[in-house]
Amino acid sequence: MNNWNSITIKISREAEETISALLIEAGSAGVEINDSADYLNHEDQFGEVLPEIEQSELVEITAYYPENMPIVELKAEIEHKIANLADYFSLTGLSVTTNNLSETNWAEAWKKYFEPARITHDLTIVPSWTKDYLATGSEKLIRLDPGMAFGTGTHPTTKMSLYALEQVLRGGETLLDVGTGSGVLSVAATYLGAAEIFAYDIDEVAVRVALENIELNPGHEKIHVSANNLLEGIDKKADVIVANILADILVLMTDDAFRLVKEEGYLIMSGIIADKADMVIASAENAGFFLETRMIQGEWNCLIFKKTENREGVIGG
Ligand SMILES: C[S@@+](CC[C@H](N)C(=O)[O-])C[C@H]1O[C@@H](n2cnc3c(N)ncnc32)[C@H](O)[C@@H]1O
């Protein structure tokens, strides 16, 4: 029977996505995230709002590796990579620890975090190996292999991107999915009626993972995946652009997004930590967009901008 090792990293919340991707690139089949913000404002079974838990600025990210992988070297490699990110994230409170798990613990941890998750009225994310989950009514299943993917697709930034896509897509649109990662947003867009989707990621591994996941779903022929840095060199006009990347990177693409979005089209930006939202809003507004919708979950913001001459219904319009 195989045993497993885990590496747990405590780090500032803003580093969560990058560190998760780094742990998966190092060979983990997935990550488990423990974030106190997820428990804030939750209700108990009687509908009472639970008392606010003191909110830590740190998240705990745990990744699992088979015991035959050299855990000491892996830990050192990961610590080195994190140290190189010191200019991007606060490393205050950082800790990196390892643990040995029995097969039973591993199986439990894995199961707990990769169950089917109904995200919106119509969209449910289902692990690819769950064959017995049946869609009911108008429910559409997004099949993902979290073992290959950047997250399970149930992170607040992804969830809000899905809510936003459901809000703006009506059918027949051309969509650009910048930073496609697992491909989850592109697959969702096919279900929501988009006619043609161009998905980009800067990371070659993400491009491969996205292609593999997209193939698991009907409508995959509508999605074209390629490696690209943001929207550099792209000339495909789009009705909607969606990007779930960190704020500091999103601001680099607002001008290109404005160039490519058709009149009355939308730019959806997610992955924005609360205190950087104003910076992203200013960047998109300077490019010519108007803010139409702002969603907040815990520390995360998702913004829907519109390219329009008609300011009615836009925030501050
Ligand atoms: C948080 S993941 C989002 C994945 C997926 N779209 C979702 O919503 O769950 C961010 C993705 O953006 C990609 N990315 C980061 N910087 C990028 C850039 N400059 N150009 C294109 N993709 C980038 C990363 O490789 C990663 O796959």
Swiss-Prot record:
InterPro entries: Ribosomal_L11_MeTrfase_PrmA, Ribosomal_PrmA_MeTrfase, SAM-dependent_MTases_sf. GO terms for molecular function: protein-lysine N-methyltransferase activity. Keywords: Cytoplasm, Methyltransferase, S-adenosyl-L-methionine, Transferase. Its main location: cytoplasm. Pfam families: PrmA (PF06325). GO terms for biological process: methylation. The keyword S-adenosyl-L-methionine applies. S-adenosyl-L-methionine binds at residues 158, 179, 201, 244. Coiled coil: none annotated. The keyword Transmembrane does not apply. It catalyses: L-lysyl-[protein] + 3 S-adenosyl-L-methionine = N(6),N(6),N(6)-trimethyl-L-lysyl-[protein] + 3 S-adenosyl-L-homocysteine + 3 H(+). Its EC number is 2.1.1.-. It is found in: Cytoplasm. One of its GO terms (cellular component) is cytoplasm. Gene3D superfamilies: Vaccinia Virus protein VP39 (3.40.50.150). It comes from the Bacteria. It is an enzyme of class 2 (transferase). Methylates ribosomal protein L11. Belongs to the methyltransferase superfamily. PrmA family. This is Ribosomal protein L11 methyltransferase. It comes from Lactococcus lactis subsp. cremoris (strain MG1363). The lineage of its organism: Bacteria, Bacillati, Bacillota, Bacilli, Lactobacillales. The gene is prmA.
